[in-house]
Design a protein with these regions (language model features):
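A short secondary-structure junction signal
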Residues: 114-118, 169, 202
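C-terminal helix-cap and adjacent tail motif
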Residues: 2-14, 186-219
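Short, hinge-like loop/turn segments at secondary-structure boundaries
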Residues: 67-68, 182-184
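N-terminal amphipathic, basic helical "cap/leader" segment at the start of enzyme domains
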Residues: 1-108, 112, 217-219
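Generic beta-strand structural signal
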Residues: 99-101, 160, 187-189
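Small-aliphatic-rich amphipathic alpha-helix that forms the alpha element of a beta-alpha
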Residues: 30-35, 103, 109, 119-178
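Short, acidic Gly/Pro/Ser/Thr-rich loop/turn segments
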Residues: 110-113, 198-200
Length: 219
């Protein structure tokens, strides 16, 4: 049952760096299956997924620094900020440094169009993400689709006893990602992959989500 699978998800604070490396072929298989089952508005998929593997620790370190610096800036406006906090160091992002694989999802200008889409375009149908201006206006759609892709990948990974975690604590603006030469569009979502060592559920004992009635309103 998919419900039982999804219940097993746990946010990883830190991955086991001594665990056996997950085969690249297994990750590719999961990614292909995720791509296959993930829907997209008009089948345009105006986003892309960059896969950082075990051999590119330098890229993971760069992403860790981007997230930590963003945290420094975000928390600085809180009047109750932690005075003992060490700038540039955040254990919440240890999963980025210690993961085996890191997924970086970004926007993508749609195209080339398939035969059906081209016919529709020629008949006057406008695809937002097929133009630069329209792509900028498609941010919400792109974020939703990346979230669906991430959730699908996570579910498939759980079936293989592989852990995943999401990170959204960063600025997606390209100027902050210049150290990664392959990033040329705004970043939308980060996902880490590996075998967990420390999990948030085991560290934080009293952090419940808002109750069902607060979130779901039956009209």
């Amino acid at each position: 049952m998919i419900y039982e699978v999804l219940k097993k998800h746990k946010h990883v604070m830190e991955y086991d760096e001594e665990a056996d490396i997950i085969k690249k072929s297994d990750i590719v298989d999961l990614l292909k299956k995720t791509w296959e089952i993930t829907p997209s508005k008009n089948n345009l998929m105006p986003w892309q997924v960059f896969v950082i593997g075990p051999d590119n620790q330098n890229y993971k370190n760069i992403v860790y620094n981007i997230c930590s610096k963003n945290e420094d800036i975000a928390n600085s406006v809180n009047e109750y900020k932690d005075n003992d906090y060490i700038k540039g160091r955040n254990p919440a992002y240890a999963n980025i440094k210690s993961c085996q694989y890191l997924l970086i999802m970004t926007q993508r200008l749609s195209g080339p169009l398939n035969a059906y889409q081209q016919k529709q375009w020629d008949n006057g149908v406008f695809y937002d993400s097929y133009t630069e201006e329209g792509l900028a206006d498609s941010e919400n759609t792109i974020c939703i689709e990346c979230g669906i892709f991430g959730a699908n990948f996570s579910a498939l990974a759980i079936e293989k006893e592989i852990d995943t975690s999401y990170t959204l604590c960063f600025t997606g603006k390209i100027k902050y990602w210049k150290e990664l030469p392959f990033i040329n569009r705004p970043v939308t979502l980060l996902m880490t992959i590996g075998h967990g060592k420390k999990y948030r559920k085991n560290i934080i004992f009293n952090d419940p989500k808002p109750n069902f009635e607060r979130i779901v309103k039956l009209i």
